[in-house]
Amino acid sequence: MNPILWKPASNRYLQELLTKMIAGKHYLNQQNLVINPPNSDNYSQLRFHRDLPYQHYVSSRPLAINALYAVDDFTIENGATYVVPASHKSELFPSDNFINNSQIQIPVKAGTFLVLDCMLYHAAASNRTISPRIGLNHVYSTPMLRPQIEWAKVFSENSQIFPTNANELLGLDFTPPTSVAEFLSNRRNK
């Protein structure tokens, strides 16, 4: 993994916060660049969404946390993120009317994180500037959720060296068994 991408993913303060937000262990489920193009009304992130594929499942505590690292300032002009407060507590998507009356736009300074429950309804705003607005998105989850990126395969294919503490943070210790026999053997050894 490129050190530029690893540094925000392994940020000590973020990891301390995640330990308080997600019960038990957590790992980096996915990481992706989010580029809000200039003068665009056709960008997919402009639609309100949740960041897990389980769109209508909610829990009494977070299953996953989104930590959006602002590479650039997120301003009103360049498409700072909108959130719908408390929408992570309802299985149903909010109505358009509810969104229009409840949404809050959150400007964020470059070099900081916007941290949200992955089930919080959110969207980028239109970027009305001449430059793209860039963020680095991280989804951290409890090990009971399948990773959206298989990190071990990413590293083996690219022959890259694991960063310090990578096994735990990338969830490599949470690999599911490949057979019933392996599952039963793991259970006996606990």
Outline where the language-model segments fall.
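Catalytic core of non-heme Fe(II) oxygenases with the double-stranded beta-helix
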Residues: N39-P107, L145-A152
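A conserved hydrophobic position in a structured secondary element of the catalytic/binding core
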Residues: A9, V84, L116
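Conserved double-stranded beta-helix
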Residues: S90-V115, M119-Y121, A125-K190
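Residues that flank catalytic or metal-binding motifs in active/ligand-binding sites
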Residues: M1, N29, L63-I65, E77-G79, ...
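A structural signal for short, well-ordered beta-strand segments
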Residues: Q31-L33, A67-Y69, L136-Y140
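Short, well-ordered beta-to-alpha junction loops that form the rim of enzyme active sites
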Residues: Q31-L33, A86, C118-L120
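Non-heme Fe(II)-dependent double-stranded beta-helix
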Residues: M1-F48, P53-Q55
